[in-house]
Amino acid sequence: MKLIKFTIGLCLGILLIALPFSQFQTSPLNPLETLVVQQGGRKKPLDTVAQETVAKIHGSTVYKHNDIKEDAMTTFMSLWLNNRNWNEEPFVLFSYRPLKERIGLDPDQKYFSFQELMTNSALGEVVREAHRKELEEQDLSRNEREALTLEGRLTLMLGSVDDNTIAIVPHPSDTKGKWMGISEEQTLYSDSATAPLMASFAVMKQMFLSGPDHLPMLVPVAADLKAGLSALSPNVYPAEGAMDQEVFFNHFHPFAKAWMLYGLAFVVMLFTLWVKPLDLYWSAIGLFIGGVAVQSYGFWLRMQIAGRPPVTNMYESVIWVGFGIAAIALTFELIYKAKYYLLAAAPLAVMCLILADSLPAVLDPSISPLVPVLRDNFWLSIHVPTIALSYASFALALGIGHVSLGSYLFTPEAKSRLQLLSQLNYRVLQVGVLLLTAGIILGGIWAHFSWGRFWGWDPKETWALIALLCYLVPLHGRLVGWIGNFGISVASVAAFNAVLMAWYGVNFVLGTGLHSYGFGTGGSEWMIASVVGVDMLFVLAATVRHKGWLTKLFHAASEQQPGKVVS
């Protein structure tokens, strides 16, 4: 019976994976998706260029034009071939409210036109001041960092409407040489060699400019264009089918499908707990394993495309932590069969993957060449994943801590469950401390080879150490009897704030230190602070309930006798 239920869950997961995901499955621009472009230090398909460009400028791969949703390829081709007035389109994402207020823009408006931003003199002053500080190696304010991010979006948009910036013409002989735009190919090749290619490009451009009715005839033209580019330099141009894997990865959306499976497993596990006769535990396990398998496949595809471990920026660390939460929870769940590991892990893994999928302007999903300090694949492959897995362990402990505190708050009489949750939490905290300790030591060794010192009190290093100490204190306190089961639950929730600071705060709030390759902008400090504040109120409520402070207060008030008035 267990095997049958497990198989049912796994089959449901496979069915979900097999369903078409994208709403843009039959675009007439599909033949152009595998057109090879040299950009950002590597060769990538035009489909990837389109998705990255639109996501970076607009904050989403879907753009709504005249109440019609356009996919990234349609929007990018319109930009590239400039078939409408993009100067006036409210296309550029600008969401940082304080900077909008400072430069006189509507703080409630999210998207602005290229023209509106380029002609804003106050914005220009902030950008110039930011560049001056960069030259003098001074720290930038949040406004200045956001202004530079916005400048990058405007620069990218300006470059996207220029034929020469989309490098599709290969170098004649050097596999690492610089490619050219279609209008610059005469600098590399003779007119006779490029004439057929220019003709194919002109036909393609005319088809697109003539309207959507002509796009279905694009297939042979796209084939001629790709064949012509390959014929120019067959030893340099990637082989036929070289871009297929990356295009498949873009459209398969493995991480989105993984969070759907995690979410479904969570719902099934809830039914198992709430509806006792309906024992679907192994079906939930099957769905959860399906999610882990799909996410693992997504990591493998990304590694094949990038040629390195997928843990080099904030986007990759978020999806890796989500994977770590799921994998660690699954391991413990298969050992203890307690249900609570999966119940705590699934929402956290879903949250990580949804955040990574829905915030491309903040968590950049593009695959880029590594900065020099990260090019040692050995240290990159062991230090960063180890640190991220420790964060995953602590996040899982955070989830179990919430389940435990919820029990203290609403069902304090369930003593056996509270004891079990404390034991489960303690095991995860031990794993997290072990991994974080190992990660800090490995990072110190890597720093010694890269920067010539083992420890330099860099903000990232300092906050990692603070996080470790925040977890070591309650673990040792439990050993010597200073804190009990409730204290472990509180510590697993409260101490995660140190992890949040080491992981998010150093990158998006402080933005200083030698770990600059992990920095970013666009994170909402107030939103994070609000979530943390509400979470601490939850901890306080559970503490008040557990300690019985309100009961004692009411009891003391009821025992007081009314005083007598003396004349």
Which stretches of residues belong to each language-model region?
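Long, compositionally biased intrinsically disordered regions
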Residues: 490, 521-522, 531-567
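Hydrophobic cores of alpha-helical transmembrane segments in multi-pass inner/ER membrane proteins
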Residues: 261-266, 319-333, 385-404, 464-478, ...
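Hydrophobic membrane-spanning alpha-helices of multi-pass integral membrane proteins
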Residues: 290-296, 320-325, 349, 429-438, ...
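Core alpha-helical transmembrane segments of integral membrane proteins
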Residues: 237-352, 356-359, 366-369
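Soluble extramembrane regions of membrane proteins in the secretory/endomembrane system
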Residues: 19-248
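Membrane-interfacial loop-to-transmembrane alpha-helix junctions, especially the N-terminal start
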Residues: 5, 278-291, 339-346, 421-433, ...
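Membrane-interface interhelical loops and short amphipathic "cap" helices
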Residues: 25-37, 42, 229-252, 297-318, ...
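Hydrophobic secretory-pathway targeting helix
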Residues: 2-26
